[in-house]
Amino acid sequence: MSENNTKLKYLCDLEEKGRRQCMESEILVDKKKFFITFPYPYMNGKLHLGHLFSISKADIFSYYKEMQGFNVLFPFGFHCTGMPISASAKKLKMELANEGEIDISVVNILKSLGFKLYCSGKCTNVECICQFTDPFHWCRTFPKYCKASLVKYDANIDWRRSFITTDVNPYYDSFVKYQFTKLKNCNYISFGKRYSIFCPVDNQICLDHDRRKGEGVKPIPIVLAILGNNILVPVQEKDLNTIIDNNVEIVTQKEIQWIQFSINNDVYVAEEDIYNNIKYQVENVYKIKTVTLDGLYPYIIYVNSNIRKSKINNKNKILTENIYNKLIADRHEKMELIKYDKFIVCYVPEDTVISRSGGKCTVALMDQWFLDYSNPEWKEKTKICLNKLTASKDTKEKLELALNWINKWGFSRNFGLGTKFPYDNSVLIDSLSDSTIYMAFYTVKHLLFKDLEGKEPLFPIKYMGYAFWEYVFGNSNEINFIDPNDLNAKKIVEDARSQFNYFYPIDLRVSGKDLINNHLIFFLMNHVAIFKENNWPKRIYTNGHLLLNGLKMSKSEGNFLSVDTALERFGTSATRMCLAICGDTNEDANFVESMANSFVLKLYTLSQNIFLISSNNQSVNVADYTLIDYYLISSIKINEEKTFTSYENIVYRDVIKYGFYNNLDTIETYEMFGGSNSNLKHWAYYNMMKQLYPVIPSLARYFLNEVLTDISIEFKNIINQQYISGIEYIKELIHKINKFTKHDAKKVNLTLIKHYPPWKELCMKKIDELKLIHKNNNDLKKIVLKECSQFIGENNRKKGILFCMDYLLYKEKYIINFDEELYTNTFKSIIEQETKKKIIILIKDDSTKGEPLCPEINSC
């Protein structure tokens, strides 16, 4: 075993000891609560590092709030609604039966996840790939792997609240039906037709999350010119200027297929892609045959370049702008041809879209049930919520744009898993629309059933309906839906209402930035529609995508890490620390494996040092504390304040900066400066572990409970920035002496200067006066330079201007909060030790070569 692996195993053993000390705690309702949620992941595979990055934002914050004494609820569900699971199960069945062409092998995907193919038919081995031809096998398999990964990761999750979605879970099914009944009662749901991206394989709308390729692609209208023999060819926007001509040239490729088809009694010819869109937008379209243009049209130019669609050569004038605008504006909800003179319009995807089923998508005019997110009253209500919401400036701006942009959303589907729409049992509710207020379900789930899918009931399913949820959410006080003699059921309903009232609203919703334009804006709008204002979400945090070693994660290119692999390679604590420093904004973050390895070594060294110091404990009187002792205490406590502020702001990079690196540097400096109080070092490590507990909970828990103890220190009049400034000054002085003196010099004269040069002191005094008089004046800089010019000599002008501006903007740099002479004399031996030179300390009132905190340094 390599040295690195030995150290990793050592850390993992300590983590496991700390993990065993973590027990599920009871909720004490006399404490303040904090409710954190994260979008439940889709159960068509195991978790990867990208999932874990976003989860870590919520998880670390949950531990932080727990440290503050809150009752933290961080639940976790498993999303199974939608078509990807059904599509994969269907494709797998075809693949095992050798039916049809397979673009991506589901067998190979499942093999990459660790499953094996024992047979091509049905067998009893639950780990056999053949079992995945049943969509619900996916729903029952991947949640357990997901949970196991997150348990090993030390996630602070209340697993009693977990569940899977879809109508296989009757409790969640009733919850979604309640939601959509409520929305229908509010007149937020309507029915109609809409041009939508459509998958012919699934025979239904294909939204972004259902696509393998083409996320964000929308339907766009194109105008087709009707040429001789009713040949339809797209008109480009640059050809919008005038009249049709019988000699128009068609530019195309030999490889493009052309289809002859009829609409009612009219026969047309169009390339196959155009035909495949028209047939889903117009009634009575029938394919006649595949044809070639040769013989049908005389003016054809064949090119070898890769063109997306055939086009008309721009040597002739084709279409007036007025006609074009009329055609585009004539969008209607009838399955009829949009035609004007020698032109027709159809809708196509603006770019290639491939569904998860492998189908090349078209545009169809579909019957749809809509959530009417364009409703102005609904939007205005959401604006109130958004104005009160806490979020980063970037996230809030993106949410505001999304709210302005959002329009009707078609939610009905014909294929996949999910809940049937209560007003039309022929359709399912899509996977984005059934996932907007499910956080409320977490608050009561543990009272309703034990398992993930409602097969182990605690509350009778017969009572689950609209009246139940109205009562729980406080919209009704009627409880007559319960049998009066069923006292246990009545108690559960009361407890459910109490739990909801205790935990709602959501205090923090964490999500990837890619969900701002859909899930997160739906999340806000549905909350304001369903719940009272006091139960609207309070804070949203979003993060960017995660890169791996600076590159986009990709299985096919070998740049990929699953959660299990990451934890196996780096252990839990190093993985968590590396995720914490990856990034804290909507910009892409970067997980660097070499950094994760370095954290393994750093945590190993830290652990060894803690064991050494813990076995050499001693006590000392506060009266015996030295300057370096005061430095240690002040620095650790100030780092603690900065660390906890960074937690609150969800800037975890700074948590690692202050809580880990700065604390380590403080302890190393303490030892370098001769600090020898083991009791204080023990206290410093204890506080460091407390500060890092949310990031490395199991390792910190082990040290806090088993190795370190909380030592009581009287902090009154001890914590002061002056102690830190004094020691940092000495460290900088050592650096300057080593840098600016001759290597072979044996002796250094260190001349401390008591005062700034007279011209600087006059400038400083004048600037302080001007800041009081002109504190709100935008021209303060100009006034300062004008007033201070009298103190700055001509030979000093450039230097003087720079000094005045620096003092005006950064006065704190010039505030001397410690005794320079005291610190220099106290730590003279340390300076000599670190520079290997004899130090002679001299004092001057002022100097042209030095000033306070910047002594003259002369080797001799």
Swiss-Prot record:
<dbReference type="GO" id="GO:0005524">
    <property type="term" value="F:ATP binding"/>
</dbReference>
<keyword id="KW-0030">Aminoacyl-tRNA synthetase</keyword>
<dbReference type="Pfam" id="PF09334">
    <property type="entry name" value="tRNA-synt_1g"/>
</dbReference>
<keyword id="KW-0436">Ligase</keyword>
<dbReference type="GO" id="GO:0005737">
    <property type="term" value="C:cytoplasm"/>
</dbReference>
<keyword id="KW-0963">Cytoplasm</keyword>
<dbReference type="GO" id="GO:0006429">
    <property type="term" value="P:leucyl-tRNA aminoacylation"/>
</dbReference>
<dbReference type="Pfam" id="PF00133">
    <property type="entry name" value="tRNA-synt_1"/>
</dbReference>
<dbReference type="InterPro" id="IPR014729">
    <property type="entry name" value="Rossmann-like_a/b/a_fold"/>
</dbReference>
<dbReference type="InterPro" id="IPR004493">
    <property type="entry name" value="Leu-tRNA-synth_Ia_arc/euk"/>
</dbReference>
<protein>
    <recommendedName>
        <fullName>Probable leucine--tRNA ligase, cytoplasmic</fullName>
        <ecNumber>6.1.1.4</ecNumber>
    </recommendedName>
</protein>
<keyword id="KW-0547">Nucleotide-binding</keyword>
<keyword id="KW-0648">Protein biosynthesis</keyword>
<dbReference type="InterPro" id="IPR002300">
    <property type="entry name" value="aa-tRNA-synth_Ia"/>
</dbReference>
<dbReference type="InterPro" id="IPR015413">
    <property type="entry name" value="Methionyl/Leucyl_tRNA_Synth"/>
</dbReference>
<dbReference type="GO" id="GO:0004823">
    <property type="term" value="F:leucine-tRNA ligase activity"/>
</dbReference>
<feature type="short sequence motif" description="'KMSKS' region">
    <location>
        <begin position="552"/>
        <end position="556"/>
    </location>
</feature>
<comment type="similarity">
    <text>Belongs to the class-I aminoacyl-tRNA synthetase family.</text>
</comment>
<dbReference type="InterPro" id="IPR001412">
    <property type="entry name" value="aa-tRNA-synth_I_CS"/>
</dbReference>
<feature type="binding site">
    <location>
        <position position="555"/>
    </location>
    <ligand>
        <name>ATP</name>
    </ligand>
</feature>
<keyword id="KW-0067">ATP-binding</keyword>
<feature type="short sequence motif" description="'HIGH' region">
    <location>
        <begin position="41"/>
        <end position="51"/>
    </location>
</feature>
